[in-house]
Design a protein with these regions (language model features):
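N-terminal organellar transit peptides
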Residues: 1-113, 117-119, 130-136, 149-303
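Short gly/pro/ser/thr-enriched loop/turn and capping motifs at secondary-structure boundaries
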Residues: 118-122, 140-144
Length: 303
């Protein structure tokens, strides 16, 4: 009977220990890798850090980048920000929103752009607002231009015998619809739009790169062409040739960080502690399965 009670007690203690260790591990992962829910802000904010914000893919919205910029702007432990750019461009308005936000942040802390494979068009628009631009010799950048591509399918429609009835209020409401060819007035309107946006692009790059490239020189190459990183450096479109870690060093120097800086990426937002626990548990299971799979793959095959 005593042995039975001892076994039950021992099992209970072991279960408690497992629960406690799991809790501590989850909590440590929580503070290390994920964003803290409300109530924990300010805890463990230490050291001189550099915030890394990825800008990837086609730029169609500014929301995520703006949110990350604001977070890093407010964190006192973040001394500088690096935008890790790998984007061929996108739409102009989101680029302008990000450009304006970087202008504000630069009054408080330095912002550096690190171009990986490509940082062209709207992505270069964003980069031009930073304190420094770092890229590799073979990176693709520049492409200061505006393009509108409007398919004209009216001949196809006529060929297959489809009639398109247009009801509109406003003479140019169906401009660029593709179901009819552009007339001269419509083409002039669209050209005027593209030219205006192009001038906005050029003007902002001139402002962002002030003192680094002459306006006349910039205008002469702001014709939509793209450049290698090395050519862009020679022209004054970027500041230095280097990789991601070189950009971090530049940011650290500008931010007054001595020694090896600690880097921080945007954290994933958790709606509840349960979400955090479930995510941590699922990651542990996946890692366990990966380990088991590796062990099996390395095992000798019977012959």
């Amino acid at each position: 009977m005593k042995k039975s009670r001892l076994a039950v007690s021992l099992t209970f203690v072991i279960v408690l220990m497992v629960v406690f260790v799991t809790f501590v591990f989850t909590l440590s992962r929580f503070f290390e890798d994920e964003e803290r829910p409300s109530g924990f802000s300010g805890i463990l904010d230490y050291g001189n850090k550099i915030g890394i914000i990825p800008v990837e893919g086609t730029i169609m919205t500014a929301d995520e980048t703006l949110k990350n910029l604001k977070k890093f702007e407010k964190k006192s432990s973040i001394r500088a920000i690096v935008l890790r750019i790998n984007s061929p461009g996108g739409t102009v308005a989101p680029a302008q929103e990000i450009y304006r936000e970087i202008e504000k942040i630069r009054k408080k802390k330095p912002v550096v752009a690190s171009i990986e494979t490509v940082g062209a068009s709207a992505a270069y628009y964003i980069a031009s607002s930073t304190d420094r631009i770092v890229c590799s010799k073979g990176s693709i950048t520049g492409s200061i231009g505006v393009i509108m591509m409007l398919p004209d399918i009216h001949k196809v429609i006529e060929k297959i015998g489809v009639n398109v009835n247009i009801v509109k209020a406003g003479a140019f409401k169906d401009i660029g619809s593709g179901v009819k060819p552009l007339d001269d007035k419509e083409r002039n309107i669209l050209q005027g739009f593209a030219t205006e946006v192009h001038e906005q692009f050029i003007s902002d790059v001139i402002q962002g790169r002030k003192g680094k490239i002459e306006e006349d020189k910039l205008r002469s190459i702001a014709d939509g062409r793209f450049f290698t990183g090395q050519t862009a450096k020679d022209l004054g479109l970027v500041d230095s040739i280097g990789n991601f870690y070189d950009a971090i060093k530049v940011a650290a120097n500008l931010g007054g960080i001595k020694g090896e800086p600690e880097i921080e990426y945007p954290k994933k937002k958790w709606n509840s502690y349960l979400d955090l626990l479930l995510d941590s548990t699922s990651k542990s299971v996946v890692k366990g399965l990966e380990y088991a799979g590796t062990a099996r793959s390395n095992a000798p095959i019977p012959r």
